[in-house]
């Protein structure tokens, strides 16, 4: 390893994945370990915070060693320790933060706290170089946001969900359809086999802002299914999935394209767990391709394995903070309600 190389050991434990990674120079994954808990939560239909925290405690020491071993690294090779400190489940976050702080204090290696949403967006940096200014559509179980990035560390929200996040809506309608948690992948697969025959609402699509709302769509879907149950009518699950997904994708793509036209970013990024949705990926790529050459941004769609929660994205984001000298200290604590700053236009 030459002096110009920077290696960061990263921790991620904001929800139901315990992950560690070693990232070199913010772009290269030397190791990535993800201990998933999905099977433990499936029978509950969603994440149980106490169960998640216990699983994090059980594996975090082991996967820290695995990440270092897989990267052929020792603590002497690590330049910084990064950790997600919010947003997320407070108990889950505390496990990662405590482990990272303990490692930092024991080794003297600098600590960097990372916003989980910034991490999701910076997963793109692990695939290709981001040219700034950039615009991201961040879509996950807890967040649906359009984020403007002036540079690698200054982010601001220009559009947000007013109620349910898109990923949350997927999981809730998945329960109605009897799909195991997490439901997103199955709904996406079913949608490709069906047609948009139910024409569910496209909330706020024509509003002159970049905000979203999915509670009305969720209610319309549930009411349609309940009404069919009452009159003993059997609905086609593939058409239901296709109709639901068409509504979500229409709204997300429409508002994203409008934001691209207004802000004229050099790069567009899709981030978050729902970034693995093939319907959304295909539509955005298709709509951006139609834009005039002078405003058509470079498009970075993260690798599917990096759409979910993982420590590699946290290491990528931490590298940018490292270069800017943005370090944390031993007072770093979990912040389950952490938010990126809102653009001035959102505060009026």
From Swiss-Prot:
Q: Which GO terms describe its cellular component?
A: cytoplasm
Any one Gene Ontology biological process term?
tRNA threonylcarbamoyladenosine modification
Q: Which InterPro entries match?
A: ATPase_NBD, Gcp-like_dom, KAE1/TsaD, TsaD
Q: What is its main location?
A: cytoplasm
Pfam families (alphabetical): TsaD
**GO molecular function annotations of the record:** iron ion binding; N(6)-L-threonylcarbamoyladenine synthase activity
Positions that bind substrate: 138-142, 171, 184, 188, 277
Q: What is its EC number?
A: 2.3.1.234
Cellular location(s): Cytoplasm
First-tier enzyme category under EC:
transferase
Cofactor names from the entry are: Fe(2+)
The free-text note explaining how the cofactor binds reads: Binds 1 Fe(2+) ion per subunit.
So what family is this one in? Answer: Belongs to the KAE1 / TsaD family.
PANTHER family cross-referenced by the UniProt entry: TRNA N6-ADENOSINE THREONYLCARBAMOYLTRANSFERASE, TRNA N6-ADENOSINE THREONYLCARBAMOYLTRANSFERASE, MITOCHONDRIAL
Q: What is this protein called?
A: tRNA N6-adenosine threonylcarbamoyltransferase
Species the sequence originates in: Lactobacillus johnsonii (strain CNCM I-12250 / La1 / NCC 533)
Name of the gene: tsaD
């Amino acid at each position: 390893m030459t002096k110009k190389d920077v290696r960061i050991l990263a921790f991620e434990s904001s929800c139901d994945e315990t992950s560690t990674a070693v990232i070199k120079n913010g772009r290269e994954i030397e190791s990535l370990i993800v201990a998933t808990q999905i099977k433990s939560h499936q029978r509950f239909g969603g994440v149980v915070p106490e169960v998640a925290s216990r699983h994090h405690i059980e594996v975090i020491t082991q996967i820290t060693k695995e990440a270092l071993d897989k990267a052929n690294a020792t603590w002497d090779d690590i330049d910084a320790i990064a950790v997600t400190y919010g947003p997320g489940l407070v108990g889950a976050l505390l496990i990662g933060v405590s482990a990272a702080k303990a490692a930092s204090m024991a080794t003297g290696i600098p600590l960097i706290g990372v916003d989980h949403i910034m991490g999701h967006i910076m997963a793109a940096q692990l695939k290709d170089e981001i040219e700034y200014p950039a615009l991201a559509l961040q879509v996950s179980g807890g967040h649906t946001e359009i984020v403007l990035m002036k540079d690698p560390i200054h982010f601001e929200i220009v559009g947000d969900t007013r109620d349910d996040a898109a990923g949350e809506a997927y999981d809730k309608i998945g329960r109605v359809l009897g799909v195991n948690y997490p439901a997103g992948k199955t709904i996406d697969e079913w949608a490709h086999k069906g047609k948009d025959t139910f024409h569910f609402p496209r909330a706020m699509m024509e509003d002159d802002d970049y905000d979203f709302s999915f509670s009305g769509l969720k209610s319309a879907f549930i009411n349609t299914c309940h009404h069919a149950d009452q009159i003993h009518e059997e609905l086609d699950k593939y058409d239901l999935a296709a109709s639901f997904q068409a509504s979500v994708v229409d709204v997300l793509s429409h508002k994203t394209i409008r934001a691209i036209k207004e802000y004229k970013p050099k790069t567009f990024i899709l981030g978050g767990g729902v970034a693995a949705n093939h319907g959304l990926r295909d539509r955005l790529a298709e709509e951006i391709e139609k834009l005039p050459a002078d405003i058509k941004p470079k498009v970075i769609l993260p690798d599917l394995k990096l759409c979910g929660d993982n420590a590699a994205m946290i290491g990528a984001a931490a590298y940018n903070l490292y270069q800017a000298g943005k370090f944390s200290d031993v007072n770093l604590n979990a912040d389950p309600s952490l938010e990126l700053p809102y653009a001035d236009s959102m505060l009026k």
